[in-house]
Design a protein with these regions (language model features):
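Extracytoplasmic/periplasmic substrate-recognition and gating elements
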Residues: 312-323
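Short, polar/charged alpha-helical segment
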Residues: 35-67
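Paired acidic/hydrophobic, glycine-rich loop segments that form the ligand-binding mouth/hinge
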Residues: 96-99, 295, 299-304
């Protein structure tokens, strides 16, 4: 058994070279809930969270093995984009890599600010290795050029994975809702099922003819990005690739129309609450709106990213997670 494991274990394929006294600095994000946590940690202690301790240990191993010190230059939202633009225009050498979001990544790449990671001079980056997100590398390349990637280096891409949370108490209150985990395991968790259960939960407690986030109960609370995820989750893609790795428009119009029609039902105002509307009219933050609506039992389901699972732990709500 051990021999087989050794034969199949992936190798790093990086030469045993020392780069003593070299500093590798990442331009990172200082953006409230989306601050970069995975590049640099000041120290390791029992008071630190698991991610910080793992980051510190990884950076120390890199220092010991290769002589490279990992640092970061953290910039706020309004300065992050400009920092890279200025560095390209007038290089200072203050940083060599950047952690950013996909919107900035596309802008940086189209403006020629980033290295092509598939170029011959970029060695030892094999995106078929399991620690890289191979699907992203394959999907984001154009003409065999790739300008950004993600993988085990970051946790923020996992935090940004969209899920559906459900209130376990409310599920028990509605006898017509079955074991939701069993639906998933049996391949029966569909948009039609979600729509059916959303409608069961609606309670206009204050009788004003609309669903309020702080008094009523809705079937689904969601933010503005969730409808896009319904399209992606429905298998909708705009492009495929040809043999030269060039994008080809290939939208399945009929399927897209079918999914859009289901989306109109899922997000109908008579059984949902759009948290963006709550923020725009209620004078509260998105964090407060989410915790109040879902965390205090005013929504059966809530659609958002995995990071909101962590945020919701401040609330007294017993909830589960569905795809």
């Amino acid at each position: 058994g051990n021999n087989s494991e050794e034969e199949t274990r992936e190798t790093l394929d990086v030469p045993n070279t020392r780069y003593d006294d070299t500093e590798l600095c990442f331009l990172t994000r200082d953006e409230s809930e989306w601050s970069t946590l995975e590049i640099f940690a000041e120290n390791q202690s029992s008071d630190s969270d698991n991610i910080s301790n793992a980051v510190f240990e990884r950076n120390d191993r890199i220092l010991q093995a290769y002589g490279v010190t990992i640092t970061e230059l953290k910039k706020a939202t309004g300065e992050h984009h400009g920092s890279l633009t200025n560095e390209v225009a007038a290089p200072t050498g203050d940083f060599q890599a950047v952690v950013t979001n996909t919107v900035n990544s596309a802008s940086f790449a189209s403006n020629g600010y980033l290295w092509n990671l598939n170029a011959d001079e970029i060695e030892f980056m094999d995106f078929t290795k399991s620690w890289w997100d191979g699907n992203m590398a394959e999907g984001m390349s154009i003409d065999n050029r790739l300008y950004f990637a993600t993988g085990d280096l970051l946790t923020s891409d996992n935090d940004a994975t969209f899920v559906i949370m459900f209130n376990k108490k409310l599920v028990k209150d509605y006898k017509d809702i079955p074991d939701l985990y069993a639906l998933v395991e049996n391949g029966e968790w569909t948009m039609d099922e979600l729509y059916k259960y959303e409608q069961l939960a609606v309670q206009d407690n204050n009788g004003n003819g609309k669903l309020d986030y702080d008094t009523d109960i809705c079937g689904l609370a969601y933010t503005g990005d969730v409808p896009y995820c319904v399209l992606f989750g429905g298998g909708i893609t705009l492009c495929t690739k040809d043999e030269d790795d060039m994008p080809i428009y290939s939208l399945d119009v009929q399927r897209a129309d079918d999914i859009a029609e289901k989306g109109k039902l899922l997000f109908s105002k008579d059984h949902t609450i759009n948290l963006n509307d709550v923020v725009n009219t209620g004078g509260i933050t998105m964090y407060e709106a989410g915790v109040k609506t879902f965390g205090e039992g005013h929504a059966l389901f809530m659609g958002e990213v995995m990071q909101c699972v962590t945020r919701m732990r401040v609330a007294d709500v017993d909830f589960g997670i569905l795809p």
